[in-house]
């Protein structure tokens, strides 16, 4: 199967593309310099030059959504331009990495530029004959950004420093190698009978403090776990979708820790 993978230089792309290739998929992952998805003319010129002979598109290219900065409306417009410029090309399978941020509260539509763009893209993906949304709430792995919760917690633990949680809440954190299992399943299931939406979550739900305790048990020493807010926050979780013999949260945390030692 020939796959066009957008956003391949991001955390998820750098983790799963080698796994796709190892399993025999033929993956093309142009950089943003090679393929500027925001610019319609650039997209046309790229495919006029290189052709478009793909069986599937995995769309991971996205702007915004970082908790360390606030998004403006340009994030929404640029995300939608990238999406529309690539979904217009016909493929048997179109996989979109959705986000838990596309809905909030009791299934309410997102009110942030990033979240609303994800909501709009997920709705369009549902209408694609071979479309599937893989909804991610939290994803972790060796190559994730240093400011992400689990990476920060592991580094604090290694340095024997306190692990700080701003506000405790139920949080679906999913190992990137398990995300790959969901992606592979979505690519291989017959088009037309594929699920339109899959939540990339585990059956059991954990608070951030539970996850911090898992980190705190990775070696012989212990560190303080500090929670700044007394009141618990809203859950950031999804319903369990599919069982694919996952590695699981605890083992995934251990594997990341061992890789970072």
Where do the PLM segments sit?
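C-terminal substrate-binding subdomain of Rossmann-fold SDR/epimerase-dehydratase oxidoreductases
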Residues: 161, 165-261
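NAD(P)-dependent short-chain dehydrogenase/reductase
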Residues: 111-115, 119, 123-172, 176-185, ...
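NAD(P)-cofactor binding segment of oxidoreductase domains
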Residues: 50, 70-95, 120-123
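NAD(P)H-binding glycine-rich loop region in Rossmannoid oxidoreductase-like domains
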Residues: 40-78, 101-106
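Conserved Rossmann-fold NAD(P)-dependent oxidoreductase catalytic core, especially the SDR/UDP-sugar
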Residues: 84-114, 132
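N-terminal Rossmann NAD(P)H-binding glycine-rich loop of SDR-like oxidoreductase domains
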Residues: 3-23
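Adenosine-cofactor binding site in Rossmann-like domains, unifying the SAM/SAH pocket
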Residues: 27-46
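SDR active-site strand-loop-helix element
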Residues: 6, 30, 57-61, 94-100, ...
